[in-house]
Amino acid sequence: KEGYAMDHEGCKFSCFIRPAGFCDGYCKTHLKASSGYCAWPACYCYGVPDHIKVWDYATNKC
């Protein structure tokens, strides 16, 4: 699956002030995803395993 990475509060994980390539590494390391990029202003991940939670508009609390 694909989607936005979340922080510990369930909000989209910001990449606003992160260096280039940060989101790819973050998605691979923390979400076990195949890749990711900064979809300004938040990290978007591809190939996320089904058991890993990604940000969902329906359950957004931010």
UniProtKB/Swiss-Prot annotation:
It comes from the Eukaryota. It is found in: Secreted. Residues 1-62 form the LCN-type CS-alpha/beta domain. The keyword Lipid metabolism does not apply. Expressed by the venom gland. Has the structural arrangement of an alpha-helix connected to antiparallel beta-sheets by disulfide bonds (CS-alpha/beta). Belongs to the long (4 C-C) scorpion toxin superfamily. Sodium channel inhibitor family. Beta subfamily. This is Toxin Tst2.
